[in-house]
């Protein structure tokens, strides 16, 4: 019997590219990957939609379809690259692009765009999307969803493990070795989002390559302490956040007109990410075990070095150790979530999101081949 194949799609809070992964399960194997750059104009529209200002409905509708088309084209490129027919794909799992994540209001909501109808129509492949809102409807945060996949992939009774996904926002998963204990996961706060935004504003570069610019600056201790005093960092899980909360306006408010050398701000923002993560790791009182890194931030050598220092005695590694490059783990996660949905299995963990119960997540947009 041929192995089942799924495709995972993600555009994270960093908005640098669309990540696509073609995955085979039982056992899990990545067949091919493809990163599709987001065109400048589309990225500009996405950034505008994801800020705290009011935006027009026509702009959102047009961007939704444009992003869906880009996702669909990225899938076709991936299939061509892998020399695989669309008929052999069970489903696509598409996270979309988050433009609002507001889990704590009177009527909590989260909104991801990247029209799955367009993806299914372009590719002919059944597409599963809108994974977060069912969890929210059950009283959960709708995020993070990755811990359920981390549990499937990395839980091990030989040691306690922490999985840190450093995207625009960083999220941490605790996988206890004790099978009687529940997995815990939450957003720790900013990952790359402030680093990238500050770099773009000051150097006109999308990101600080390997953290070299930050490494040349001096950490401003008083400012780090002020930033870490933000109430979110003291809030116990379940919790989740986004760039609606942690953005340049938040940073400027904390700077309060005080002037710093831009490179020192970059160094301080790396320290904010590293210390906020390390503080969360300490809460698990682990005197041994490992911290596994994934996401784009795993390529920031300066940040990784700070985590190694601050998170001792944990062994710090990356998901490369199990054969999955850190850049692709989240895309693989959404391929797995699509599989869970089509197999009528839950995709959330109430111990992570705070939902009343586990649930089958997502909506299904049928392709040309109806297997279910």
Curated annotation (Swiss-Prot):
InterPro entries: Anhydro_N_Ac-Mur_kinase (IPR005338), ATPase_NBD (IPR043129). CDD domains: ASKHA_NBD_ANMK. It catalyses: 1,6-anhydro-N-acetyl-beta-muramate + ATP + H2O = N-acetyl-D-muramate 6-phosphate + ADP + H(+). Transmembrane segments: none annotated. Its EC number is 2.7.1.170. It holds the Pfam family AnmK. It is an enzyme of class 2 (transferase). GO terms for biological process: 1,6-anhydro-N-acetyl-beta-muramic acid catabolic process; amino sugar metabolic process; peptidoglycan turnover. GO terms for molecular function: ATP binding; kinase activity; phosphotransferase activity, alcohol group as acceptor. ATP binds at residues 12-19. Keywords: ATP-binding, Carbohydrate metabolism, Kinase, Nucleotide-binding, Transferase. Pathway: Amino-sugar metabolism; 1,6-anhydro-N-acetylmuramate degradation; Cell wall biogenesis; peptidoglycan recycling. Catalyzes the specific phosphorylation of 1,6-anhydro-N-acetylmuramic acid (anhMurNAc) with the simultaneous cleavage of the 1,6-anhydro ring, generating MurNAc-6-P. Is required for the utilization of anhMurNAc either imported from the medium or derived from its own cell wall murein, and thus plays a role in cell wall recycling. Belongs to the anhydro-N-acetylmuramic acid kinase family. This is Anhydro-N-acetylmuramic acid kinase. It comes from Coxiella burnetii (strain RSA 493 / Nine Mile phase I). The gene is anmK.
């Amino acid at each position: 019997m041929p192995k089942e194949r799924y495709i995972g799609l993600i555009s994270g809070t960093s908005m640098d590219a669309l990540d696509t992964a073609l995955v085979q399960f039982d056992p899990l194997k990545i067949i091919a990957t493809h990163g599709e750059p987001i065109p400048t104009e589309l990225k500009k529209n996405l950034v505008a939609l994801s800020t705290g200002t009011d935006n027009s409905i026509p702009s959102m509708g047009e961007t939704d379809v444009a992003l869906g088309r880009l996702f669909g084209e990225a899938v076709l490129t991936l299939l061509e690259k892998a020399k695989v027919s669309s008929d052999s794909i069970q489903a696509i799992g598409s996270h979309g692009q988050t433009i609002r994540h507001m889990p704590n209001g009177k009527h909590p909501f989260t909104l991801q765009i990247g029209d799955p109808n367009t993806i299914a129509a372009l590719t002919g492949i059944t597409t599963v999307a809108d994974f977060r809102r069912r969890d929210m409807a059950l009283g959960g945060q709708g995020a993070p969803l990755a811990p359920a996949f981390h549990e499937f992939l990395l839980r091990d009774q030989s040691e306690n493990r922490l999985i840190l996904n450093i995207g625009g926002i960083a999220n941490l998963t605790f996988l206890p070795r004790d099978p009687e204990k529940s997995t815990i996961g939450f957003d720790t706060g900013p990952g790359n989002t402030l680093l990238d935004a500050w770099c773009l504003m000051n150097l006109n570069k999308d990101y600080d390559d390997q953290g070299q610019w930050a490494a040349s600056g001096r950490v401003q201790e008083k400012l780090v302490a002020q930033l870490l005093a933000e109430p979110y960092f003291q809030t116990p899980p379940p919790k989740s956040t986004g760039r609606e909360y942690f953005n340049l306006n938040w940073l400027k408010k904390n700077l309060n007109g005080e002037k710093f050398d831009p490179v020192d701000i970059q160094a301080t923002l790396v320290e904010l990410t590293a210390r906020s993560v390390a503080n969360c790791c300490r809460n698990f009182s682990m005197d041994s075990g490992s911290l596994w890194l994934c996401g784009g931030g795993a390529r920031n050598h300066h940040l990784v070095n700070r985590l190694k220092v601050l998170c001792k005695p944990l062994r710090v590694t990356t998901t490369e150790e199990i054969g999955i490059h850190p850049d692709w783990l989240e895309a693989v996660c959404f391929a797995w979530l699509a599989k869970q949905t089509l197999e009528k299995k839950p995709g959330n963990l109430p111990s992570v999101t705070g939902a009343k119960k586990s649930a089958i997540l997502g909506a299904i947009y049928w392709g040309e081949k109806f297997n279910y």
